[in-house]
Amino acid sequence: MIRTLAARLAAAALATAAALAQAQAPDRIVFATDWLAQAEHGGFYQALAEGIYRKHNLDVTIRMGGPQVNGLQLLAAGQIDVAMADGLQVLSAVEQGVPVVAIAATFQKNPTVLIAQPGTAKIEQLKGKPIAIASAANTTYWPWLRQQFGFSDEQKRPYGFSVQPFLADKTLSQQGFATSEPFSIEKAGVKPVVFLLADYGYPPYSEALVVRRDTLDKRRDALARFVLASAEGWKSYLANPAPGNALIRKDNPQMSDELLAFGHRKLREHGIVDSGDAKRDGLLTMTDARWRATVEFLKLTRLAKPDVDYPKAWSLQVVRGVKVLP
């Protein structure tokens, strides 16, 4: 009988230990970025490199995006838990009935820029002059530029994702990202003039963190810890990017130290991550007003579709509980 009691106690102890281990097991999150690893993803890699995700009981895998990767499709198919996407992409997904929702925003300023020739003093001077833009601009920032500055479609030139036409034609401006194309132009010996569209009121968030609606309902606590840990990672990365950059180079060996340093410097210089509402509410914050301003921009430029419940595209439930000040 004593042996039986001892066996039962041992079994109970093992069951308790197993239950505790299960309770303490880290929550697994697979997170897909929107491009190959770069400085723009630095805070997430920093959180991984410095064990910040582990500290918050998370087992996070970062999957690089790329030209053939559609993160929102992977998300809708249940192959990942969190996707990184531009705010306009999220609104477009909701237009199509995809049950996804943005829960945080990495970039308080959209990094889209117009890059002009040296000597250009104001963005208004680009009116009537040739500008190389990609076709995707027609449903994003180009209608906004037409409305804000009176640009016309006659100015548009095809953009082949190369800075060589800009370097060869001294009348040409082009699109770009603050952290990327200006670097290539400067390497060629030209100091371009860069106009960050967000500084002129272009409203969409960039690098929003997006989940499926059912994931938000079922895993809210894990998502809250993911956003909190990511915000802590970004604060650390902006201060000292070395740990995150080492992981970035591991994932993307083609990334140079020089471009990483340039990207990090421009993130700080332009306040892309830590400006605006982030100064008051913390890194990765979002506001209802900002999302509604983006929807209003779509309506004013006739890009919005009728009878779409656009507010379904974002939720402040998670990010309201996160306050990691820059």
PLM region spans:
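Extracytoplasmic/secreted envelope proteins and their assembly/folding machinery
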Residues: H41, Y45, L72, A76, ...
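Pocket-lining segment of extracytoplasmic ligand-binding domains
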Residues: L88, F161-D257
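Short, glycine-/small- and polar/acidic-enriched structural segments
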Residues: Q24-A168, L172-F177, F195
